[in-house]
Amino acid sequence: MLLCSLTLTLILLAVSGTKCDVKEFCAACSGVPGIPGSPGLPGRDGRDGVKGDPGPPGPIGPPGGMPGSPGHDGLIGPPGPPGERGDKGEPGERGPPGPPAYPDEELQTTLHDIRHQILQLMGALSLQGSMLAVGEKVFSTNGQVVDFDAIRESCARAGGRIAVPKSLEENAAIASLVTKHNTYAYLGLEEGPTAGDFYYLDGAPVNYTNWYPGEPRGRGKEKCVEMYTDGQWNDRSCLQYRLAICEF
């Protein structure tokens, strides 16, 4: 049967004059699909791939074991800045009396000699009418006649201040120096904000006065005080020239 089909085909080809290779004819003919074969054996492992990016951090794990013992103290750091000063504390109890001072005979002798020399000097100056001691005060003058500010400055340089009487006895002592030099003298007083109110140079109110009748009457224009030769006071401008008398 197969042989007859092949023979018939060849005859038809020869008649039509067409050349055909048996191999090409067979390639063009589609056959019936065969039955699928059995699966092959597994292939070999492939090569390692490229390293991937890091993944996100995982969740916190459960607590570990018991905490360990405290470590040793560290090194002491540098001191911090000083804090604000606190409030003043309450005074403490008075302590017991201390031992008596050791009497230094040589020192006592030196002090006695100095005291004696001072008394001699004061006596000599008092005879010249340039210094007088009254109670715990010493009044002294160099005989210069200058304005109020110059007197204040010269007395301060000498360690004193402008003389001002605070009692009748002190007023008389200063008046004797004024009389000796036959000129008026400024006193250590200044007028305050209110006209007619005078104060000591440290700002304290006056506790002794010896005003001339009707004084003071400068009405705020005469800020200083002068002493007359009779010991009475008068308010006066601070720019006048008066005898410089200091107290120590």
Swiss-Prot record:
Gene Ontology biological process: respiratory gaseous exchange by respiratory system
Region forming the signal peptide: 1-20
Compositionally biased region (Pro residues): 54-65
InterPro entries documented for this protein: C-type_lectin-like, C-type_lectin-like/link_sf, C-type_lectin_CS, Ca-dependent_lectin, Collectin_CTLD, CTDL_fold
Residue ranges of the region described as Disordered: 34-105
Annotated compartments: Secreted; Secreted, Extracellular space, Extracellular matrix; Secreted, Extracellular space, Surface film
Glycosylated residue positions: 207
Cited SMART domains: CLECT (SM00034)
GO terms for MF: carbohydrate binding; metal ion binding
Function statement: In presence of calcium ions, it binds to surfactant phospholipids and contributes to lower the surface tension at the air-liquid interface in the alveoli of the mammalian lung and is essential for normal respiration. Enhances the expression of MYO18A/SP-R210 on alveolar macrophages.
Protein name: Pulmonary surfactant-associated protein A
